[in-house]
Amino acid sequence: MGVSEGMHWQGELLHIHVAAKAGVPMLQLAEARLTTGIGVDGDRYATRLGTYSKKHHIDRQVTLIESETLDALARDHGVELSPDEHRRNLTTRGVPLNHLVGQYFRVGACVLYGGRLNVPCRYLEELLGKKVFKPLLNRSGLNCRIVVDGMIRAGDRIEWCDPRSLDVSLRRANEATALERPPQAWPDE
């Protein structure tokens, strides 16, 4: 049985965070707008002011990490990372992020596509002064593409989305966008 055939789980969006530019503290929001092709309104990657903005990738519009990973990091490695320190936009609970690569899923009314696993970076270690690189290998979160935009709120339900339930034009647009390298120019270019 494929992963998508057996996805019967339900998770929760615990926290939403954005940073206006690279290196500044993350700001926690009660709600945020996700914009297709852009990212999380007010976030450094939506405005192209992030550390990795020059390496833009269509699947890096919104980033997620599991609260269970943060718990394991503290338990197994003695490293405490608060939700505003991990530098991901969304903190989830009960969501199997590593299994969502290549899958569609809903966060509230929005639909995301799991593009690729997030890879830990030394930049985070330098920024925080905490040894997180090795402990976060293979569990650093998920980079996603926004397929259906809208508002999300802390407490929203997260669940797998059968791609057959999406409008065919949305699926085709998502697939076509994935082939673009780089995506169309940003408004300020």
Where are these regions (language model features)?
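Metal-cofactor-dependent catalytic cores
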Residues: 1-189
